[in-house]
Amino acid sequence: AWSNSLFEDNAEHGLGMHIGQKYLRDQAIELVEEIAASDKASAEFKAAAAKFIETKDNTRENSPAAEALIAELEKAANAGCEKSKEVLAKKDYLAKKSVWIFGGDGWAYDIGFGGLDHVLASGENVNVMVFDTEMYSNTGGQASKASNIGEVCQFAAAGKEIGKKSLAEIAMSYGYVYVAQIALGANPAQAVKAIAEAEAYNGPSLI
């Protein structure tokens, strides 16, 4: 799924999407555990539920486990299990979702920095990718907090007199945020590796 937000509310919007689907998923997982604990649950259902719970934090492995669980839930629902019907109403939220928040440097370093900082500090398992052009690209090319010292832009011909804000170091200061800097054109393999590591990390990530 894809959703656009107001420019300055990007981080908060992404976090809200994550928390909303997480809440619905937690409700469904609680019901699955209740059904599996019942004496009426089949051995196949118990096995599918156990595999689903075991892999619930692994995006890659949880998707097939969720599909297998849904098949067992449908059998149980057809046999009259009301709780299975409740879970099936939320089946789109069973598989672990990967949440990515995309934005430019004008948003991340400046107008949306407060929201970005709040999201990273929350500890929630969301990923943020900042496309850093090192200037205000949307408004024609002015120097920004992302611009390097001495940088000349379209509307900053004299060069920037102060250094670049270190977004990576600010995020690293929390101690629990995965942080990587990539240059796709310079090292595609490292870029893919960093994205995979960010996805696998159970916590906030910033690339």
Please report, for each region that a protein language model flagged, where it lies by residue.
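Generic detector of short, locally flexible boundary/turn motifs and exposed helical patches
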Residues: S63-E67, D92-A95, A143-S147, I170-Y174
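An acidic, phosphate/nucleotide-engaging active-site surface
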Residues: L69-A76, K85-L88, L167-Y176, I182
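Thiamine diphosphate
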Residues: A1, A77-Q142, A186-A198
